[in-house]
Amino acid sequence: MSQRKARGPPAMPGVGHSQTQAKARLLPGADRKRSRLSRTRQDPWEERSWSNQRWSRATPGPRGTRAGGLALGRSEASPENAARERSRVRTLRQAFLALQAALPAVPPDTKLSKLDVLVLAASYIAHLTRTLGHELPGPAWPPFLRGLRYLHPLKKWPMRSRLYAGGLGYSDLDSTTASTPSQRTRDAEVGSQVPGEADALLSTTPLSPALGDK
């Protein structure tokens, strides 16, 4: 009896082996949990280091600083460019106003666009060229100016569509301001035959209806 008590209860077969297997099974799970915890603890540091690397890549190098310096230089020079552009526009506007003032019978308060001024100036130059007896050169003049007649601003304004289309053909409005080539030749023949009568007519006829009434 004493030997049996000292020895203790007999061990059941297979019980110790099952306990060791259970411990062996539990150990990998514990290792997995520990590895997960370690990963979660290390992840923020890894993310920070990765973000630091990404930030270091995104930071501009010497080229970026050079580009930034160029941008600053351009922004500093932009007021000078704006002032230069304003002076250019002012000079161009003054030139067009001077050209408009040189056109005959254009009131000073008449508002004409730049295209209007150019069309009227071209038509007036064509009229003067024909008056002097010179033919308009074909290749030197644009096609729409070859048949252009003198456009009177007071007759054409404010009909802008007729301002550009009236010079291409002979319209009723042009008949009062310009004469056909046959009429010009007839007038020249009459003037050469009776120069005294023509001078008398020019001296007696008033310049305008308003002056004639006076």
Swiss-Prot record:
- Free-text tissue specificity from the UniProt record: Expressed in liver, kidney and spleen.
bHLH domain residues are 76-128
GO MF annotation, one: RNA polymerase II-specific DNA-binding transcription factor binding
Comp. bias intervals (Polar residues):
174-183
Entry annotated with the keyword Nucleus: yes
Mind telling me which SMART domains this protein's record contains? HLH
Q: Name the keywords, alphabetized.
A: Developmental protein, Differentiation, Myogenesis, Nucleus
Residue segments, region Disordered: 1-86, 174-214
Q: Which GO terms describe its cellular component?
A: chromatin; euchromatin; nucleus
Recorded hits in Pfam families, A to Z, give: HLH
Basic and acidic residues: which segments have biased composition? Answer: 40-49
UniProt-annotated location(s): Nucleus
Extract the Gene3D superfamilies matched here.
Answer: Helix-loop-helix DNA-binding domain (4.10.280.10)
What are the BP-aspect GO terms?
cell differentiation; decidualization; developmental process; muscle organ development; negative regulation of muscle cell differentiation; negative regulation of transcription by RNA polymerase II; positive regulation of gene expression; regulation of transcription by RNA polymerase II
Function of the protein: Inhibits E-box-mediated binding and transactivation of bHLH factors. Inhibitory effect is similar to that of ID proteins. Inhibits the formation of TCF3 and MYOD1 homodimers and heterodimers. Lacks DNA binding activity. Seems to play a role in the inhibition of myogenesis.
> What domain notes does the record hold?
Both the bHLH region and the C-terminal portion are essential for inhibitory function.
Task: Give the record's subunit note.
Answer: Forms inactive heterodimeric complexes with TCF3.
What is the protein name given in its UniProt record?
Answer: Transcription factor 23
The organism is Homo sapiens (Human)
Q: Which gene encodes it?
A: TCF23
